[in-house]
């Protein structure tokens, strides 16, 4: 980070987040609000993005593993991953705000973040982040040792990610890898030796597909900051491909569908998997791209986000059907 801090914007210093002024979040004590903002409590879509790889990995591992995981254990692990995702996302957001505070002060959307506007000090944000990581690892402590090691890998990549935006336009790939590793983590939690033969290739295919799904999300989300990023020097795929976004997103979508289809063939999934996880996902993402292309969706906050969610639900739906077809029910566990 530069030696001379970018000054806090006068309007940002007096900012009050409207999401905490009314509605359910208004009950939070005012002194806690900056820390809730630090972990993006008011923006739950990030938890959805971080959580879905765990569900895919859990269902993939549960249905592909020779030792079928019963429904009650699947439900138990799914709850563990909610906590892991929530706390790791909070830690990641806090660290990102610490590292990016100077860039954030130059970006209209980001200059009101708690560290950038001075509501939370750098030291306090770091302590908060460490506490979140400790709570996250407590959540996955009942899982196999491989899960702890993969969790550590996720943590290291989360630390590296904010710095990547300074040196490469492909920081989104690092972010995607960070979240996609949780797919492998959850597969191991389900008892599947995910990176050992004969599961190595299908695991790599799905991990790559999830990485690209995160890249897709972040490129669309980052488009709103392109003008500010060009001024401040922040790198990213939304900046690099700003004149060819639809071509980039279409290419990513086709590769994702191809990788998921390849996985289905390799592990001998049934026809409903291809209907939902391949065709359904493909249709939802292409519809989203079409909406962006023809200016139906001007921002991520429009209906485009729902098409992305539909794509993810289709992906999960195919794996859920595979699980229900192959795994013993709760009363037979």
UniProtKB/Swiss-Prot annotation:
This is Prenyltransferase stbC. It comes from Stachybotrys bisbyi (Hyalostachybotrys bisbyi). The chain crosses the membrane at residues 74-94, 125-145, 147-164, 173-193, 201-221, 247-267, 272-292, 304-324. Its EC number is 2.5.1.-. Pathway: Secondary metabolite biosynthesis; terpenoid biosynthesis. Its main location: membrane. Pfam families: UbiA. It is an enzyme of class 2 (transferase).
